[in-house]
Swiss-Prot record:
InterPro entries reported in the protein's UniProt record: Peripla_BP_I (IPR028082), SBP_2_dom (IPR025997)
Entry function: Part of an ABC transporter complex involved in D-apiose import. Binds D-apiose, D-ribose and D-ribulose.
Annotated signal sequence range: 1-26
Protein name: D-apiose import binding protein
Compartments reported by the entry: Periplasm
Key words, A-Z: Periplasm, Signal, Sugar transport, Transport
Protein's organism: Paraburkholderia graminis (strain ATCC 700544 / DSM 17151 / LMG 18924 / NCIMB 13744 / C4D1M)
Record: residues binding D-apiofuranose: 39, 115-116, 162-164, 168, 218, 243, 263
Family note: Belongs to the bacterial solute-binding protein 2 family.
Pfam families, alphabetized: Peripla_BP_4
Length: 312
């Protein structure tokens, strides 16, 4: 009888401990949702957010939506079911993601967006993004200068549903189009993909062998274009990217790529977590919903200081 009572007491204590632990985890859980970590930019922001959240004492779940809005919606459901108290989100489309962020808000979970805005305000608590237009103008000026203000060039743009693709393209053209001897002979999407950019660049070289430059909407496309140019023995073609990845840093040091634009992924991710922490503790971030972080130009002169999307 005494043994039976001991087992009952032990079971009750175990259940109490499990319940308390589960409650504590839910009270301290931050969900971090980004596109695929195959792109080093998204991996860097997820890793940075994860590390900062843990340093502040939070548990985390790190999830990947692969730029699929339906999958993103399911992951938000997962965050809700797990009792997350905040979501750090690099979203899967400026329009398609509105419903997911609204769903999180309806469940009482604040969202803190990084890298990509949504086409709505008042739903997310914060939208912390790189100043893509300002950064693209930096890249555009470097590109024009490298080509001596003249020559046929190609633009590789990102995924159409991503608002950043259009903003960067506009920033580039608002600079480049001021120079009448700069002629764009081809503009194609490579959907942020290195593999796709390689294939696109191979085809473009066949129809436009006189191309002098390639300006890309991100670094993975710049790397794909650079690889295609290298295979074609076209080391004379100037390539400029956008992101600030370690791969492009190394390519700049090898003279394979001329420049890139650093968008500070680590800084935005850190800011998002710290603002989430403050919001959960005080009910306010103390900052406006929409926040822009300026970008920096990376060339051979400062590439050695670049590491994991930050100048060290």
């Amino acid at each position: 009888m005494k043994a039976s009572k001991r087992w009952v007491a032990l079971a009750a204590a175990t259940l109490t401990l499990f319940t308390a632990t589960g409650t504590a985890q839910a009270a301290n859980l931050i969900a971090i949702i980004t596109p695929s970590h195959d792109n080093p930019f998204f991996k860097a922001e997820a890793d940075t957010a994860n590390a900062r959240a843990k340093a502040l004492g939070y548990d985390t779940i790190v999830l990947v939506h692969d730029d699929d809005a339906n999958k993103q919606s399911n992951l938000v459901d997962t965050a809700i079911a797990r009792g997350a108290k905040a979501i750090i989100l690099d979203n899967a489309g400026s329009e398609a993601s509105i419903s997911a962020v609204r769903k999180a808000k309806a469940a009482g979970i604040p969202s803190f967006l990084i890298d990509r805005e949504i086409n709505a305000t008042g739903i997310a608590v914060s939208q912390i993004v790189s100043n893509n237009y300002q950064g693209a103008q930096l890249g555009g000026r470097a590109f024009v200068k490298a080509l001596g203000e003249k020559g046929n060039y190609v633009e590789l743009v990102g995924r159409e549903a991503d608002i950043n693709a259009g903003i960067r393209s506009k920033g580039y053209h608002d600079v480049i189009d001021q120079f009448p001897n700069m002629k764009m002979v081809e503009r194609q999407s490579a959907n942020w993909s290195q593999t796709e950019a390689y294939r696109v660049m191979e085809t473009i070289l066949q129809s436009h062998p006189d191309v002098k430059g390639v300006i890309a909407g991100n670094d993975t496309m710049a790397m794909g274009a650079s690889a295609a140019l290298k295979a074609a023995k076209r080391s004379d073609v100037i390539v400029v990217g956008f992101d600030g990845s370690n791969d492009v840093r190394d390519a700049i040091m090898r003279n394979d790529i001329r420049a890139t634009v650093l968008q500070p992924a680590a800084l935005a991710a850190t800011e998002a977590v710290e603002q989430a922490d403050k919001y959960m503790k005080t009910g306010s971030t103390g900052k406006p919903e929409k926040q822009l972080i300026n970008c920096s130009l990376i060339t051979k002169a400062n590439a050695g200081k670049l590491d994991m999307f930050a100048l060290r």
